Amino acid sequence: TYDGTPFLFARHLARLRQSAERIALTLPFSDDEVLGRVSATIGAADLPGEAYVRILLTRGVGDIMYDPRACPSPTLIIIVKPFVPPPDETYQRGVKISLVSVVRNHPEALNPRIKSNNLLNNALAMQEAHKHGAFEALMLNYRGEISECAQSNFFIVRDGEVLTAPLEAGILPGITRGLVFELGEQLHLPVRETTLRYADLPLADEAFLTSTTREIAPVVMVDDLTIGTGRPGPVTTRLLWAFRGSRVEIEGSRIEA
């Protein structure tokens, strides 16, 4: 939340519905009903600051078997806890990430576009990254292309262009990722999708991560490779400040902003 309001709630909920539809799961509540339940949970938590909100949709109670029809009544779970943002040095100095051996899920096995509760692929990647002392795990897809990070989308900046892998590379359509395209238009910065490979990293002037909880975080190292000058770059900084300047005004309604 920002100022107690769920950030881009409608976009998050739309992605939840789309993900559920991909696995033949129905969210049996309207957007207003879900927002009401989220707001009530935030109120009941009575937190002193901002809240981290997680909405889970399960198939509900039923027999232990592989047939989803055994669980006909979905269960909605809303988790609210205090939000602890990354430390200021994340943005002032940037972070190190690690290219891990764990490959992102094949889209024809478990499509990464589905925002699901099955995070084993991501967790294994983060395990390996932590062994390397890294903030995040950078993952390749089954074709050996850069896809995304375990908990974030990934961008590079090269020759004034902001580049990120296409959805077809097998990535999650991140909410903040999408917002970067909008901010790029506002700032007259070209932002586009393109195939990225490890060989593109030494040529990058800057790199950054995006996620709802991390906002836009500069990446200054990938393992032992220094990105650009080794410090947060001007394009990343412009995008971060544009994000922070507009985050409570986006689309002009409390549900969206």
Predicted regions mapped to residue ranges:
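Secondary-structure junction motif
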Residues: 176-177
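Glycine- and Gly-Pro-enriched alpha-helical subdomains that act as flexible
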Residues: 138, 145-167, 172-173
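Conserved alpha/beta cores of soluble small-molecule-handling proteins
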Residues: 1-138, 142-145, 172, 182-257
